[in-house]
């Protein structure tokens, strides 16, 4: 076995002896192997690759590698000394008996088996075992033949075996010399490995092909063939990056046992450090040592592929990194070098090409003007000024006494106002109309003591020629007064403030800061067969009532959108209103010419029974209504069918009713009949079952009325104005001017100090009743007529419904401080209704406690926005 090793050593050592040193342009030496003669073996010969990479690639052990050449030489010398000491030990122990020699041979055999097992393990892959092709096996045999580090290792083993034999002393000396030569060559190769690291700039940032390879990486290059990474089991480049610390300096982990963290947050322990002997043995044993680099991010050794080595060689040779790129492609002559005898365009020169350039003339003119003004200095003037600046400077002794004052006056100089130019009256031969008559002359003379009241400070005169004009006797006086004006009258500058258009726009807060407000459609209440004109909600917010053109009133459950009850009315329902008093359950419905007071029979049964008991018997009234009231309205009894449907009181009117609205306490409610002229508004009292006309005259076509939430006031909106009446004093408090042609509806703030008026002209007017009778702000948010507006009882929100299918929610904050104006910010446009016959959304109402909004439209639906 020793003889076989000696033969292998003698066969592989010439591969090292064949290396020659070639001096490069930068003065350094590189080792270069002799190229094999055979062309076929040259294609599989990798010793040139090994030598080139040995010249520059580091072996990956940053802890043992040194930057300076001197340190590297010392470490190699120490390794040589250690091996010499080992040889001496072997020579001293040559007297061992045969049994110890047999044990040594068995240990060597075990070590060789372990090495072969390591080689097998290093070449193995986690893929399923498959039969290798003949080409791959032949290629592996070719790769194993020129392995230089293995030869060095076998030389060392041969030396150890021969040291046991006492008769091989001469051969040991020759082996020592060969080992020293090999160590010196390896030392120079290590020095050149650092140069490639510096040239490549190996850093944590990965480059293409150079990075951390998974354990399956070897299987992809098995047999020297580059297999598909997905076939090899590598399906993600990001999963290979096990260290998740990022692109940071890795020297931060020098003091720790770990080098980073993996994807699961576990520490990545640094690999065990190896000493110089282990590194040298690895260099001798590992066939891939020359192409192994160390990953600074994980501390592991990475074997470079053939593609990476080819890329490094091309970069070191100064070539293009792309193999497919050719520097010597055939030149394509896009533009011919031959001179064409006939031009492509033979247009005659334009006339302006023969004329001097006007722009150059202007430029020369500007330069001449700058020379005249002294802005541009000639070379002689520039040199003269430079000489003066370098020379001594002289100053006046008393210059500081008046310098600041003079500079201030020059800096703040204000031009004196010019005198007015003379007019026609000051001419020596003015037209006749400019001459004074006797009356004007007497008036001018009468202001002798008050000359500032005269229109002219002189009397116009007429002369036939300029020679007849006498000396102006007031010339000296006028010059004197002019000097007094310049001397005594102060002059000042007026600073003009430039205000941009962006400063005129008020700065509004972001809608995100004004939440909560309705943003999304939550529920749709379907059941009506015609457009829904009005909607109202119970004071507790559990039930909803709607009135439609299908002559029905429906009661819904808010949380489930389920229709609980349907009440037929016999006519079109134009308005519904739930009584705001939570102690009774009652709904007022305006259907045609009747007002129906309906008990919905939902909610608390005790409350329903209490309402029926309250409305069971009509109170006896001692007062007798006049004929004007009895002909307009009658409180009548209901039928049996109406009683079963929940109708408790019926009030007949003589005209069609457009609106019904409740007072805040729930005892009074008002109805509006626009076609009834001076009897358009009626106020009904539920407890006494009597009605009255608040107005004896009508000053316009009344559209809607509204009770004040706190005070005994009534808001009456005609087509163009809004009047506020005091019901106790029975007088007009104020008249509001919305500056519109037709008012559609209005809503009052819960505090009662602000009023919102909607018009059919796409505008909303916000009135501050304490501020003015004119609108505080006009909102033009909709594209069509606005049907209704509403305020929220608790949140600073208001909404508007329009025929453009949209419901706009806005923020309206009213402050307790009377000096601070209300804050109005549009928030969200909700367009979910469908347009039917040019009608969109009809009515809106807020939930009493939640920031929710209900809207009814012409598409027969009610929608809930939350």
UniProtKB/Swiss-Prot annotation:
Transmembrane listed as a keyword: no
Region of interest: Disordered: 1-180, 214-241
Gene Ontology CC terms: nucleoplasm; PeBoW complex; preribosome, large subunit precursor
SMART domains in the cross-refs: BOP1NT, WD40
Transmembrane segments: none
Entry-linked Pfam families: BOP1NT, WD40
Domain of life: Eukaryota
Record-linked PROSITE patterns: WD_REPEATS_1, WD_REPEATS_2, WD_REPEATS_REGION
Keywords on record: Nucleus, Repeat, Ribosome biogenesis, rRNA processing, WD repeat
Residue windows of the WD repeats: 527-566, 568-608, 697-735, 738-777, 781-820, 836-866
GO MF term set: ribonucleoprotein complex binding
Main location: nucleus
GO BP: maturation of 5.8S rRNA from tricistronic rRNA transcript (SSU-rRNA, 5.8S rRNA, LSU-rRNA); maturation of LSU-rRNA from tricistronic rRNA transcript (SSU-rRNA, 5.8S rRNA, LSU-rRNA)
Extent of Acidic residues compositional bias: 37-52, 60-146, 167-179
Subcellular location: Nucleus, Nucleolus; Nucleus, Nucleoplasm
Family: Belongs to the WD repeat BOP1/ERB1 family.
Protein function: Required for maturation of ribosomal RNAs and formation of the large ribosomal subunit.
Protein name as annotated: Ribosome biogenesis protein BOP1 homolog
Taxonomic classification: Eukaryota, Metazoa, Ecdysozoa, Arthropoda, Hexapoda
